[in-house]
Regions:
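Inter-domain linker/hinge segments that demarcate the starts of reverse transcriptase
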Residues: 1-22, 87-94, 158-170, 238-266, ...
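C-terminal reverse transcriptase regions that engage the nucleic-acid substrate
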Residues: 274-390
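Metal-dependent nuclease catalytic cores in nucleic-acid-processing enzymes
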Residues: 88-99, 157-163, 442-464, 492-502
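RNase H catalytic domain
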Residues: 214-220, 225, 233-236, 454-517, ...
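A short, polar/acidic, helix/strand-boundary loop motif
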Residues: 135-160, 191, 244-246, 308, ...
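Catalytic palm subdomain of template-directed nucleic-acid polymerases
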Residues: 57-72, 118-121, 180-262, 284-293, ...
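C-terminal functional segments of enzyme domains
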Residues: 279, 283-288, 502-560
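Catalytic-core region of right-hand nucleic acid polymerases
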Residues: 6-163, 242, 293-346
Length: 571
């Protein structure tokens, strides 16, 4: 298979071969064929890879007491421009926003044909990209897999493609302005929202007034378009073969033509014309159901990998990290399962390991992984709402903010405002808690936020809570469900279960200590000062205390039963 792919390189004009040396000096790179069948949804796929990470550190001496560096290893990557890749889920969120117009919306996608191989190399680099084969030397003149520089270059080039397609779609919409009353009303509302947000006309056009959204992950394009009927600027219907055209189809065709003008081609077998469903990067985006979910083939593959690890009991650290990373992606469509990975991640970070950098799975780690395997084969098919990452604006009904803080030596406090009331919860650390040196400030900060959430959100009638904290570790535990310690893991597990039961959603925000004044005062025995300042704003103060099941740090220390019973609040 490797020889077949190497010969294809010459047949396609991507490289030259033969026994006559094409240049000097010349470097022959190791190469391999990578099986990407699983990643390709079970469809057989094999990719030729030039291994520019060879020689590995310490393999070949350089004669001066050091070792010969690989091509990848000698690159100064810190000097490269930073490039962030998009998430496929953003297309689902964008589709939900477009659906708010009341008009039909379609999703569509494409995949570049041999994307890397379209890009050439600088002539000064060609000598180091040769391959030795039975037919002589082959000089690979195009970008390849296995080169760190090519991966960066090609992903940055996709930014240009996305920009060009957006401009082309904007030109289409200018030539064929919408006449759908619901869309026109929606655009006017968004135009006003853009003005109130202080957006420039350019930003407003891109972020508020676009009739389409597109993102490109390397060469995988995914998009959503409003699908209204097309009229030209004079109001005449745009017809094709006796049928009036729709915007999404013209957007799709325009994107493919823009791709062609930039020297690329779309893989026809992977094109996804406008419809209610699109598959991208392991996700299914389903507009008819209003859900996003992990593709079935990928769920089954993940479950099989989990089964293998659980059965073995101990596993190489790199293999475990690979599987856990896949499950983190799966958790994007099943957030409740994120805490199930805590024990396994704890095993990864453990200082003690078996020989050969192998990791021994604890009973809790196996239990969490088994829950994931069962979920991947069952209820996870429901997925998450399209706009699950979006959050209502502060001030809308059922939406509010909880500010929390903790001091290391005094106590904790949290507050929110409901109507003309300041709801305040606070308390002091016990002597036992102060004597416990393992009870670190990050845990105290997370506890303060948790107590504020469970005590105040129900009292204020909040379904959507902006949680403000000034501690980065607590922020990470709440936002990414990535707690650092066993106590924090117990809190995250309990608060996640509570939010799911209560139908409460949380958006975590960072606030500086200076701006977190009332929570800071309350945590330092300054409740009286908070009450005095609240009175200046004509706010009545009502004290609310959480149930003991949430306040008990004994349950946190033991890691069992925290927040599990007696969740009623006391006043």
């Amino acid at each position: 298979m490797a020889r077949e792919k190497l010969l294809k390189t010459e047949q396609k004009g991507w490289g030259t071969g033969g026994w006559q040396l094409p240049c000097w000096p010349i470097r022959a790179s190791p190469y391999s064929v990578v099986d990407e069948t699983e990643r390709n949804g079970g469809i057989p796929k094999f990719r030729l890879t030039n291994d520019l990470s060879w020689p590995h550190a310490g393999m070949i001496e350089d004669g001066d007491g050091g070792s010969v560096a690989s091509i990848n290893g000698s690159m100064e990557r810190g000097e490269w421009p930073r490039n962030s890749l998009p998430r496929a889920a953003r297309t689902g969120e964008a589709a939900a926003i477009l659906q708010a117009s009341g008009a039909p919306v379609k999703v569509w996608g494409f995949d570049g044909e041999a994307y890397y191989r379209v890009f050439g190399r600088q002539r000064a680099e060609l000598w180091r990209n040769a391959i030795a084969m039975a037919e002589g030397f082959q000089l690979d003149e195009r970008c390849c897999f296995g080169s760190a520089a090519d991966a960066s270059k090609c992903s940055r080039a996709s930014n240009l493609i996305a920009h060009a397609i957006r401009r082309a779609l904007r030109d289409v919409d200018a030539a064929y302005p919408t006449r759908e009353p619901a869309v026109l009303e929606w655009l006017e509302e968004r135009r006003q929202a853009a003005a109130e947000s202080g957006c420039s006309p350019e930003d407003a056009e891109l972020r508020f007034l676009s009739l389409a959204y597109i993102s490109i992950y390397i060469d995988d394009g995914t998009a959503a378009s409003i699908d209204d009927l097309l009229f030209d600027c004079e109001g005449k219907a745009v017809m094709r073969n006796g049928v009036q055209m729709r915007r999404a189809q013209l957007h799709f065709e325009t994107a493919l033509e823009t791709l062609r003008l930039l020297g690329h081609a779309s893989s026809e077998l992977k094109e996804q014309p406008p419809g209610a469903v699109v598959e991208s990067l392991g996700l299914e985006i389903n507009l008819a159901e209003g859900r996003m979910r992990i593709l079935k083939l990928r769920r089954e593959a993940y479950a099989a990998k989990v089964d293998k690890i659980v059965e073995s009991g101990c596993v190489e650290r790199s293999e475990l990290v690979s599987v856990l990373s896949k499950l983190l992606f799966a958790a994007s469509c099943y957030p409740a399962g994120r805490p199930w990975l805590n024990a396994a991640w704890r095993a990864v970070r453990a200082q003690f390991r078996l020989g050969g950098d192998r990791v021994l799975l604890s009973k809790k780690a196996k239990s969490g992984l088994c829950r994931w395997a069962a979920t991947l084969r069952g209820e996870m098919a429901d997925g998450v709402p399209l706009a699950h990452g979006a959050f209502p604006a502060f001030g809308l009904p059922g939406t509010g903010a909880v500010y929390a803080d903790a001091s290391g030596l005094q106590g904790w406090a949290a507050w929110t405002v409901s109507g003309d009331e300041l709801l305040l919860t606070s308390g002091e650390w016990t002597a036992e808690e102060l004597a416990d040196e393992s009870f670190i400030i990050a845990e105290k900060e997370l506890l303060a936020s948790t107590l504020g959430l469970v005590a105040l959100a129900p009292e204020a009638g909040l379904s959507f809570v902006y949680s403000y904290t000034d501690n980065t570790n607590a922020e990470g535990a709440m936002r990414r469900l990535a707690p650092k310690t066993a106590r924090m893991q117990a809190m995250v597990t309990a608060r996640s279960a509570w939010m799911r039961e209560q139908g409460v959603f949380e958006c975590v925000e960072r606030i500086t200590s200076e701006r977190n004044l009332w929570a800071d005062l309350g945590s330092r025995n300054g409740v009286a000062e908070v009450e005095r300042q609240a009175a200046l704003f004509n706010l009545r103060v009502r004290h609310v205390q959480p149930a003991q099941a949430w306040r008990s740090t004994t349950a946190l220390r033991d890691g069992e039963g925290y927040g599990a019973s007696d969740r009623d609040r006391t006043e």
